[in-house]
């Protein structure tokens, strides 16, 4: 009886132990399993986005903390925007695409983060780091790629290009004095380059929603978007690679091909190789037959030239579709020809205008914008009210610009022919020119304009301690 009681006690302890082990094995790990048909596992696309945040965004955040101040605060906002996008991508990997109006509601957390970043720049225009803040503010709209189809990658590149306008200013100010700012620029631009690579791999033609989960809605996805789950720790480093596989062809000698053998056989003939040449009689020699000289050079019929189908001369110039549209905060005016009625009237202080390859056209920009760039245009006229940043003309020809209000700086680079009509309020603007010709400034005088040429030729002398450069005055 005693033995039976002891056996029962041991059996009971074994059952309790098995129950404990079973509970530990059967419980799903955190974030896994299915709830209401939604798989809680992390999709490869989300893991790749986590890698982007843990590497590029983390590097940018580290360099921003080194600079501290407004730059650090701004960078923390950028980090928050990427976390909001990570939460949205997690939802996309688990739910099917809803109606467009539902998508707009689901995108609201990201939109609010972007707006917060742009508002911070506007509220800190007096900051010593304003160019840093502007680089981020003008390009953070790249996070809106999730609403772009069918090619979100190029959209991110355009926003990256908008950032370089200001990062170039940062490099100009600090590249010889403080390399911390150079590291900051590099780490920030790397974010968008890496994001383009991520999009090419996981969302090439637009956002890829789940095909199996339930349809997303504000109710079903609110918990994901609002909770903003923390990022998982970075994965451990991969194990060291094994030894390389043996090279199978190490002991194999290359066997000579028949064509190569024949070639060496001919070369080994030495002087005997000329025995195979055919003798040319005098009647076929041009210098001994006057009739051949009279005919001039005759092409061999077997060597008629056929133009290559890929020859650039045979290709007609490609026609591009004219563009006049607002993308984010950037007005794109491209490939306009023979248009003198182009007008941009609904403008904001945050917006920039980029004008590219327009010919024989005129554009009027009303209101106040941040900056205007005229690139690769010919016989183009630009009329604008106010610009708070810079107007830049580059790689262009025969440009006319009329300022109705104010502009602090006008830059002219690699341009032939540029006429600037200034208003009374714009007479204090700075004009910076390089590698350009036929530049004239027209200032108002007695209800008319008086023209002044911008010097193109300069005289440089050594005054004993430094070089002194001044415009060369050539009298006719």
Curated annotation (Swiss-Prot):
The alphabetical list of record keywords is: Cell membrane, Membrane, Phosphoprotein
**Which InterPro entries does this one have?**
Adenylate_cyclase-assoc_CAP, Adenylate_cyclase-assoc_CAP_C, Adenylate_cyclase-assoc_CAP_N, C-CAP_CF_C-like, CAP/MinC_C, CAP_C_sf, CAP_CS_C, CAP_CS_N
Alphabetized Pfam families for the sequence: CAP_C (PF08603), CAP_N (PF21938), CAP_N-CM (PF01213)
The annotated regions of Polar residues compositional bias extend over 288-299
**How does the UniProt record describe the way this protein sits in the membrane?**
Peripheral membrane protein
Q: Which GO terms describe its cellular component?
A: plasma membrane; postsynaptic density
Cross-referenced SMART domains? CARP
Tissues of expression: Expressed in the heart, skeletal muscle, and brain.
Provide any one GO MF term from the record: actin binding
Organism superkingdom:
Eukaryota
**In which residue ranges is the amino acid composition biased (Pro residues)?**
230-247
Composition bias of kind Low complexity appears in 300-317
Chain positions found as Phosphoserine: 300, 308
Q: Which cysteines are joined by disulfide bonds?
A: none
Q: What happens when the gene is disrupted?
A: Knockout male mice have a reduced survival rate, while females survive at close to the expected levels. Knockout mice are also prone to eye infections due to eye developmental defects, and surviving males develop dilated cardiomyopathy by 12 months of age. Male and female mice with cardiomyocyte-specific CAP2 deletion die suddenly due to complete heart block.
* SUPFAM superfamilies xref list: C-terminal domain of adenylylcyclase associated protein, N-terminal domain of adenylylcyclase associated protein, CAP
State the Gene Ontology BP annotations.
presynaptic actin cytoskeleton organization
The ranges of region (Disordered) come to 223-322
Q: Where in the cell is it found?
A: Cell membrane
Domain C-CAP/cofactor C-like, by residue range, is 317-454
Family membership noted in the UniProt record: Belongs to the CAP family.
Function summary: Involved in the regulation of actin polymerization.
What's the protein name?
A: Adenylyl cyclase-associated protein 2
Point out the gene that encodes the protein.
Cap2
